[in-house]
Design a protein with these regions (language model features):
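Glycine-rich phosphate-binding loop of ATP-dependent small-molecule kinases
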Residues: 1-240
Length: 240
């Protein structure tokens, strides 16, 4: 079976990390809308909720915000990743055991993975999640998930950061406006694919990037960068 084209000749897969409400979903929508419309994506949370509707034994985990067993989580990831390359999954890995499984999986398949980690203050998370008015987003569950994330996430990043042969890591500030987060993501992608001449050029004029309110990015810069990256991806696809 022929190997599928990589993202920018560099990555087989993207894993998106961070707390629920930190801006992961918005980043994915921007990626699909502006840059990678055909990227295969999945949220572990969405998959769990679908499965809990079919399997009562899983419903307790989603209702109480408890982590789903690692063997179930890793199995769901592996199944999705093998069928959808290049692709993206939101919410995996969430603890050290899952991170070790991801390392093993990447090594077995000779994959290079882009890790996108979004950090966000609890105040912003609460504001966003309660506005969603979803059943499993009540305040007690939000705090419980936040506590779990603070306890488990450092070990995940430690494991992945120790394997630069398999992973590239981008860290994003989810407290900022979603347009700024997306721009930061794109600039980091350009840096990682060694297009530093563009990355450095954008620092010349802040006015080129920021609108008059000084809080949001001029949409033209995101459209330009996405067009630029898409043209590279298309040329690479045509050569395969």
């Amino acid at each position: 079976m022929a190997r599928k084209p990589l993202l920018l000749e560099k990555w087989d897969f993207i894993v998106l990390l961070g707390e629920s409400g930190g801006g992961k979903g918005t980043l994915v929508r921007n990626m699909l809308g502006y840059w990678l419309p055909n990227l295969h994506t999945a949220s572990m949370g969405e998959v769990f909720r679908r499965k809990s509707a079919e399997d009562p034994s899983l419903k307790e985990y989603t209702e109480k915000g408890i982590l789903v067993p690692d063997d179930v989580t890793c199995g769901i990831f592996r199944e999705f990743a093998l069928a959808n390359t290049p692709g993206l999954i939101d919410g995996f890995p969430r603890n050290r055991k899952q991170a070790i499984d991801l390392i093993r999986f990447a090594k077995e398949n000779n994959w290079r993975v882009l890790v996108v980690d979004i950090y966000c203050d609890i105040e912003h998370i609460i504001q966003r999640l309660l506005a969603r008015k979803r059943e499993d987003d009540n305040l007690a569950i939000v705090y419980s998930r936040h506590k779990q994330h603070k306890e488990l996430h450092p070990a995940v990043m430690e494991e992945l950061a120790n394997r630069p042969d398999l992973f590239d890591v981008i860290r994003l500030n989810g407290n900022r406006h979603s347009e700024i987060v997306f721009t930061s993501f794109l600039l980091n992608v350009l840096r990682l694919v060694d297009m530093l001449y563009f990355y450095d050029m954008t620092n010349i004029s802040t006015d080129f990037l920021v609108n008059n309110d000084e809080t949001t990015i001029n949409p033209a810069i995101n459209r330009w960068m996405c067009s630029f990256l898409t043209s590279i991806q298309n040329k690479m696809n045509d050569s395969n």
